[in-house]
């Protein structure tokens, strides 16, 4: 007869009317009993012939692709002018005095952040924007391009200009070596008074026939300032600063993506000073002489008259011919849905390319991408805005993968010890937290995103046309991409983007200037950054509490008024560092803080309401006696595991599920096991804060007997049959707790000390978890353990009781670090004197 739920509860000693613990508990360690129960509950029957169930409620297999929905009305979020102050360490010093070693180390990690992959795989530009929404290809293309353009304008991306240079918007950092109109500006590291040392050497950017001569000049200019050699020094030295043949030129040198159809080299001097203004298309009448002013770095405007007419004309034709969009102007419409009609809507489509305010040298950057991008909803609650997903997963795969640094996250108990108090709480929202941290330009060639331009993107996705060879294109295959769908999409998009359609239809390659989200390094760097900042804040306001996890920052203070003044002070400090907060999203929690999925109050910690609801729904949908795919079980365990510490039996109750996932076999819920789990998760108990205290109760065991020392009283007992040492140590700890009721027990067994009971016999683990709930353990070396003698059957010998103080841990969060701490070889774990026990000190 299968085991009923009531019998199973009795067996696990969850009911009060169980017999004496010393007799009942050792039975649960018996292998035979565990095996029989597993068979009764159908836990061991892994090989099933019935087809597996692949969906339970909302849970599908871990890797099943839930198809995201595309929203044509997505708004691109705006990014404030985020610029983290470069002298952040000095700013913190002014705020709090000398920094501790830890804080300094963490802040140096991100100023600037560096990224060293083992191998970088370059992908063709066509893979830049992922065809994630086959129904909305063109729409998605333009929305993504607009998002990337917004990021570039906000100074979060570099734009690749040539193989060795990039441009960006926003304020430059001292490690970004600036080039101005083809010159390298060498700067010293201090950037405050702009006392940068700028020798006026002329380094023409593109590789030119006068290579050695210019390189030697650059080499000299590193040694010291030289006489200014005029704006066109490169040309005066006997040779034309020619741009690499056949690439349409702009005042910025080569764009480096689209080859132009004019085959000859342009001999105009437009790499060191500007020849034509950005795009020759703006001037409808191609005048033989073009004049344009451009401010040189020294401040005087250089006018360039009388450029030979043939060169200016060849350039203007080159830029029109190389521009897929504008070519439609000179062609005949192929149908009523021809792009010719859209291109002729307005005369001035603006420039073919935009350039940033600053231009810097970069390592060699190929015209490729290293990761694809696509758009999704910003979050489940906000579907009106989009979020860019960047896939740099190549760095986490294969045998060349980067092993990302590990970092400490406080576990549930440490978090409760730290935050469970009667403080008032408030949480801050850092807007675009990842985009605060600057990356070194050397990382740019590894983190490239972009697109191959609309023509190739459409050609790649439409089945009837080949990818056009830009070099030898005829008017006919220019029109290959015309279609009704494209025409309709572009007409609608024209309302949104206007003449930007032209700009966005060009190819572009962008590298990250701030850390992107799709790289495993980013969460680590963000965690280091926010924890260092919070550490500084905690030391500046010792009577308050500041804590962070990733971009989630919480502040706690004794009273609401106090909290508001703390909020004002901390906000000003963060703004002075260049950290952008979102004041609309500041949440005031009162006395129970919502943080990391938990509700934390003075009574302890519980999971948030939405998680409890999810668990209830999960049990409602959970089928009985049907094998469930182990990938779905992974999902179920993920949800139940989060709330396991709040149940009677904890993690051990989920062990049968873990076992089936490890064996990659389907799992079948028997009615009893489902009822047992359901009951477990109906009543959740808070995890309470551990209190410091003196340990008075000790437990010890040998394979045949156990012994307790409770105050001056000694007890001993024997087991019917010898048991493994870890099992008997756990039994002894359970007896000590049930006999004395003490919440603090001394033991010499590391497994019991760890409070992970998942490796014990299943029934024993479940029962022990309930008996030892809320118990703290202190380590006692065996030689000093007063319960050692009774466990060996010797009651007469007394070892003196130890005075063992217990201090609850707060993980790696040192709350009261002395300013500036003297680093000892092994730092003590810093004691968290709760704000409850510390008399309030004025700031």
Curated annotation (Swiss-Prot):
Site residues by UniProt (Priming of reverse-transcription by covalently linking the first nucleotide of the (-)DNA): 63
Keyword annotations of the record: DNA replication, DNA-binding, DNA-directed DNA polymerase, Endonuclease, Host-virus interaction, Hydrolase, Inhibition of host innate immune response by virus, Inhibition of host RLR pathway by virus, Magnesium, Metal-binding, Multifunctional enzyme, Nuclease, Nucleotidyltransferase, RNA-directed DNA polymerase, Transferase, Viral immunoevasion
Domain Reverse transcriptase: 357-600
Purpose of the protein: Multifunctional enzyme that converts the viral RNA genome into dsDNA in viral cytoplasmic capsids. This enzyme displays a DNA polymerase activity that can copy either DNA or RNA templates, and a ribonuclease H (RNase H) activity that cleaves the RNA strand of RNA-DNA heteroduplexes in a partially processive 3'- to 5'-endonucleasic mode. Neo-synthesized pregenomic RNA (pgRNA) are encapsidated together with the P protein, and reverse-transcribed inside the nucleocapsid.
One GO BP: symbiont-mediated suppression of host innate immune response
Catalysis performed (reactions): DNA(n) + a 2'-deoxyribonucleoside 5'-triphosphate = DNA(n+1) + diphosphate; Endonucleolytic cleavage to 5'-phosphomonoester
Primary gene name: P
Stretch list, region Polymerase/reverse transcriptase domain (RT): 347-690
Family to which this protein belongs: Belongs to the hepadnaviridae P protein family.
Miscellaneous notes: Hepadnaviral virions contain probably just one P protein molecule per particle.
Region span, Disordered: 221-240, 289-315
Domain notes: Terminal protein domain (TP) is hepadnavirus-specific. Spacer domain is highly variable and separates the TP and RT domains. Polymerase/reverse-transcriptase domain (RT) and ribonuclease H domain (RH) are similar to retrovirus reverse transcriptase/RNase H. The polymerase/reverse transcriptase (RT) and ribonuclease H (RH) domains are structured in five subdomains: finger, palm, thumb, connection and RNase H. Within the palm subdomain, the 'primer grip' region is thought to be involved in the positioning of the primer terminus for accommodating the incoming nucleotide. The RH domain stabilizes the association of RT with primer-template.
Biased composition (Low complexity): 223-235
Activity control: Activated by host HSP70 and HSP40 in vitro to be able to bind the epsilon loop of the pgRNA. Because deletion of the RNase H region renders the protein partly chaperone-independent, the chaperones may be needed indirectly to relieve occlusion of the RNA-binding site by this domain. Inhibited by several reverse-transcriptase inhibitors: Lamivudine, Adefovir and Entecavir.
Residues the record lists as binding Mg(2+): 429, 551-552
Location of region: Spacer: 178-346
Domain of life: Viruses
Protein name listed in UniProt: Protein P
Residue numbers spanned by region Terminal protein domain (TP): 1-177
Gene3D superfamilies per UniProt: 3.30.70.270
A Pfam family recorded for this sequence: RVT_1
EC number: 2.7.7.7, 2.7.7.49, 3.1.26.4
Alphabetized GO MF terms: DNA binding; DNA-directed DNA polymerase activity; metal ion binding; RNA-directed DNA polymerase activity; RNA-DNA hybrid ribonuclease activity
